[in-house]
Design a protein with these regions (language model features):
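Alpha-helical membrane-interface segments at transmembrane helix boundaries
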Residues: 2-9, 95, 117-120, 124
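Hydrophobic alpha-helical segments of membrane proteins
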Residues: 12, 16-20, 82, 86-94, ...
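Generic transmembrane alpha-helix signature in multi-pass membrane proteins
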Residues: 16-21, 50, 61, 91, ...
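Membrane-cytosol interface at the C-terminal ends of specific transmembrane alpha-helices
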Residues: 27-78, 84-93, 146-149
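C-terminal transmembrane helix and the adjacent membrane-cytosol boundary/short C-terminal tail
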Residues: 88, 131-166
């Protein structure tokens, strides 16, 4: 039932939610943040539920056979299996949200996309500002992608400590 509820915010694109919220709340960053947050909750809910379904129950059963409580079974049997995927998906959504925020800003939701739209007024000669904004956006996305990629590799190679994974 929860999974079906999370399908609703995931099914509606951020841009549609943002445009409705801009109409209701006015322009600015708040409608964009709400739109991105709703879509992210839906997407991560689906991804996390699939990770949970694919987790092996054998460690949990083994821990139960030696008298471990529910918390111990989850902490030692489930979390080590799902934490790397949770973190990987969260980092992926962070990258997606950066891109989405630029697009939503372009349609009037504030932020760097809004600045980009304002500088792209043809005929005012602000091409250097527009190019600088494009470059900053590109470099930000590449930097976040590289950092999250390295972090994901650390997790999947087993080099990350338990403190980092949690």
């Amino acid at each position: 039932p929860v999974r079906r509820v999370l399908d609703v915010p995931r099914a509606v694109p951020e841009i549609v939610v943002a445009l409705v919220l801009i109409f209701l709340l006015g322009g600015g960053p708040v409608p964009a943040m709400i739109a991105i947050a709703l879509h992210t909750v839906g997407a991560l809910g689906k991804l996390f539920s699939e990770v949970n379904e694919n987790a092996s129950l054998k460690p949990v059963e083994g821990l139960e056979s030696v008298g471990a409580g529910w918390g111990q079974r989850m902490w030692f049997g489930v979390i080590p299996q799902v934490a790397p995927n949770y973190l990987s998906y969260a980092l992926l959504r962070f990258e997606i949200n950066i891109r989405a925020s630029a697009i939503l800003g372009f349609v009037g939701a504030g932020g760097i996309g809004y600045d980009l739209r304002n500088t792209m007024s043809w005929g005012q000669g602000k091409f250097d500002e527009a190019a600088a904004i494009f470059l900053l956006l590109f470099l930000t996305i590449v930097a976040v992608d590289q950092i999250s990629s390295k972090f994901r590799h650390r997790l999947t190679d087993g080099q990350a400590s338990a403190k980092v994974m949690l």
